[in-house]
Amino acid sequence: MILAEGLHAVRALHERFPRVPIVADLKTMDGGYLEVELMARAGASWCVVMGVAHPATIAACVAAGRAYGVGIMGDVLAAPDKPATARLLQDLGAEVIIVHTGYDERRQVIGASPWDDLASVVAAVDIPVQAVGGLTLADLPKLPAAGAPLVVVGAPLVIDNDSFRASESDDERLGRVIREVVRAVKAQR
């Protein structure tokens, strides 16, 4: 049921914003081909597979991505050896690596962040890297210089840090952060 409802959301976003890339952050662990196929048919541009999934699942996601013109992002969340997992994802055909420090992990390991693994993962692969989870607005403009040019601006702006409730939005702050990130990305070219 959750997958089916997600399809409705992806389809609606694609219809409303046909030129905007849509990432289906499924965190796929099994059923890789089917999940990517379904999301691709709904209008997703990218799908996310977990690096701790079986290599057959990762390969199935990549095969479906190629068949349907969808990019595959590999997430190293919970991998015991993040650089090795990132290399495996790259070798199996993922096009982007996500260095992700999860919400629960950050609650248990105070201070944990993608910065802990970012340099070693960037050094391990030849494909773009994105950092997610526990980043602050001040971190975002620094990511491109650290080898993570794909910046996600989301949770720090719209979700309260200690709960999944909406935070107060500040359009001026959002505009400033986006301008800083764009400058940082352009400086890396």
What does each of the following model-derived ranges do?
Residues 1-3, 20-29, 45-56, 71-79, ...:
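Catalytic beta/alpha-barrel core
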Residues 3-27, 61-78, 112-134, 170-189:
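Alpha-helix-loop-beta-strand connector modules within alpha/beta enzyme cores
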Residues 4-5, 31, 138, 160:
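Surface-exposed loop/turn and secondary-structure junction residues enriched for glycine/proline
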Residues 6-9, 34-37, 59-62, 85-87, ...:
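Short secondary-structure transition/capping segments
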Residues 16-19, 41-46, 66-71, 91-96, ...:
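Glycine-enriched alpha-helix->loop->beta-strand junction motifs that scaffold or abut catalytic
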Residues 31-42, 80-92, 124, 135-153:
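Catalytic cores of alpha/beta
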Residues 44-56, 97-108, 146-177:
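Glycine-rich phosphate-binding active-site loops on the catalytic face of alpha/beta enzymes
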Residues 83-99, 108-130, 135-138:
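Short loop-to-alpha-helix "cap/lid" segments that border enzyme active sites
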